[in-house]
């Protein structure tokens, strides 16, 4: 596996490769990331991964400086997965001058849910993903469903800019107790780690209640999500949202949508101590 930081060297290395499968990451790799590499291999060859902690998507009070950076360990993991190239640019490589041009997602998708609580986050994501796509020129790119809203935004961006890349969704990888794998799980204390799976269990309860009552016309979505928020707060969580949305556009479902069996997803973000976790579950 070649480790490359220069954009020009990367382009030289990939010249003539017309079926590149790309997995962008911020490093501190875990089994969830590695599952993305394996899925990428099913859809293209060679597999290219990137590691870049993108300052543009961190807010002023977020964890950019303390975000775990474990490059050597990440390299060893990627080598075992047969990754062809790791693109690991420095900030100077990616942004040799101030990044004055930004890619901003539409407000109806970028300013809700995560976008409401992390202003500017998706603008930073879209900008760096567009630049990475320009550098790598992939034919396919794999994004995890754990970041459900990000997946939808990137997919819509690729479609509206007519980018020659297929966005492949990857299922969320979970620990045995249900907690979605995340680099930020490392911030949890032992006590918090024991409580953390409750977030997924709460989503499961929302899903079950939706199927048993809301879809039968016996309760409202608002009643179900309010109960979930109350449950999390009662266990010491600080939830930002528990929201049931249409899978197609992440807008709230209408009664007509529910009656017609529109595919839905329940999404949540909540702090446990100082660590903010996100998760989702399709209904």
UniProtKB/Swiss-Prot annotation:
Record EC number: 6.3.2.1
Superkingdom field: Bacteria
Residues reported to bind beta-alanine: 57
One CC-aspect GO term: cytosol
Catalytic activity: (R)-pantoate + beta-alanine + ATP = (R)-pantothenate + AMP + diphosphate + H(+)
Active-site residues, as the UniProt record annotates them: 33
Positions with a binding annotation for (R)-pantoate: 57, 150
Keywords assigned: ATP-binding, Cytoplasm, Ligase, Nucleotide-binding, Pantothenate biosynthesis
Pfam families assigned: Pantoate_ligase
Keyword Magnesium among record annotations: no
One MF annotation (Gene Ontology) recorded for this entry: pantoate-beta-alanine ligase activity
Pathway the protein acts in: Cofactor biosynthesis; (R)-pantothenate biosynthesis; (R)-pantothenate from (R)-pantoate and beta-alanine: step 1/1
Binding site for ATP: 26-33, 144-147, 173, 181-184
GO biological process, one term: pantothenate biosynthetic process
SUPFAM superfamilies: Nucleotidylyl transferase
Record's subcellular location: Cytoplasm
CDD domains membership: PanC
Family: Belongs to the pantothenate synthetase family.
Extra information: The reaction proceeds by a bi uni uni bi ping pong mechanism.
Function: Catalyzes the condensation of pantoate with beta-alanine in an ATP-dependent reaction via a pantoyl-adenylate intermediate.
Subunit comment: Homodimer.
Protein name per Swiss-Prot or TrEMBL: Pantothenate synthetase
Gene source species: Ralstonia nicotianae (strain ATCC BAA-1114 / GMI1000) (Ralstonia solanacearum)
